[in-house]
Amino acid sequence: MEMVEEHIKGILKNRKIHFTLIDPDEQTPQEALEIAEEAILGGTDGIMIGGSTVNNDEVDETCKILSENIEVPIILFPGNINSVSKYADAIFFMSYLNSTNPYWIYGAQALAAPIVRQAGIEVLPMGYMVVQPGGTVGWVGDAKLVPRNKPKIPAAYAMSAELLGMRFFYIEAGSGADKPIPPEMVGYTKKATEDMVIIVGGGIRDGEAAYTAAKAGGDIIVTGTVVEETNDVRGKIEEITAAIRKASIE
């Protein structure tokens, strides 16, 4: 497989992207594979693996079975230093920018760096910011949650992250959020940066929300909870990816 970052930027030359987030803590590796296969049939461009409370065995077993059976990129979305697997294609090596705890801003990264190097997987440097309500990741990460009516705050953080050399910026409302990120916030964030890939997640459960996030400036739209809640993963992902593609050409 080509380098994941090159793959992502190659797709972005033509259209926006959809990733499916799978939490190994919520299903067995075999169930995760079944979800991934259905999501791929629905048009997803990649599988993210991660969660706020997973352990290494769950991540490793899930990544291994996926690597043996699917062709799209498998990207780690780590909740802590125990979320690294050599079976993944890449890792979002991220700093939790609005955490009040130095551990999440740079401590965990220092501890994880030797593990990531040893695993030999591609690194995608990313700034990460959580907006209200925040969910589990906001609580676990000791976040100073961004108010939903303050779109210029994540824009400023994204700009600073880009100046520090990060190439991805993930803005999210937390897993299972009742509302997605406000489109004004996505728009300000995109306009504040030059070449960053803007990722938007949390609270996106249907095509309309995905369309709005992509149209506002999101380069990659992430959905996770929706594949755990639906009985028709392929159909739901088809709805979402079709909306993202529509936003790409309008």
Curated annotation (Swiss-Prot):
Catalytic activity reported: sn-glycerol 1-phosphate + (2E,6E,10E)-geranylgeranyl diphosphate = sn-3-O-(geranylgeranyl)glycerol 1-phosphate + diphosphate
Keyword Lipid biosynthesis appears in the UniProt entry: yes
Enzyme class label: transferase
GO aspect biological process, one term: glycerophospholipid biosynthetic process
Record-listed E.C. numbers: 2.5.1.41
Xref: Pfam families: PcrB (PF01884)
GO cellular component: cytoplasm
Lipid metabolism is among the record's keywords: yes
InterPro entries the UniProt entry points to: GGGP/HepGP_synthase_I (IPR039074), GGGP/HepGP_synthase_sf (IPR038597), GGGP_HepGP_synthase (IPR008205), GGGP_synth (IPR010946)
One example GO MF annotation: phosphoglycerol geranylgeranyltransferase activity
Cofactor(s) required for function per UniProt: Mg(2+)
Binding-site residues, Mg(2+): D23, S52
Subcellular location: Cytoplasm
Pathway: Membrane lipid metabolism; glycerophospholipid metabolism
UniProt main location, coarse: cytoplasm
Binding residues annotated for sn-glycerol 1-phosphate, in chain numbering: Y170, I171, E172, A173, G174, S175, G176, G202, G203, G224, T225
Keywords assigned by UniProt, alphabetized: Cytoplasm, Lipid biosynthesis, Lipid metabolism, Magnesium, Metal-binding, Phospholipid biosynthesis, Phospholipid metabolism, Transferase
Protein purpose: Prenyltransferase that catalyzes the transfer of the geranylgeranyl moiety of geranylgeranyl diphosphate (GGPP) to the C3 hydroxyl of sn-glycerol-1-phosphate (G1P). This reaction is the first ether-bond-formation step in the biosynthesis of archaeal membrane lipids.
Name of the molecule in the record: Geranylgeranylglyceryl phosphate synthase
UniProt organism field: Methanobrevibacter smithii (strain ATCC 35061 / DSM 861 / OCM 144 / PS)
Organism phylogeny: Archaea, Methanobacteriati, Methanobacteriota, Methanomada group, Methanobacteria
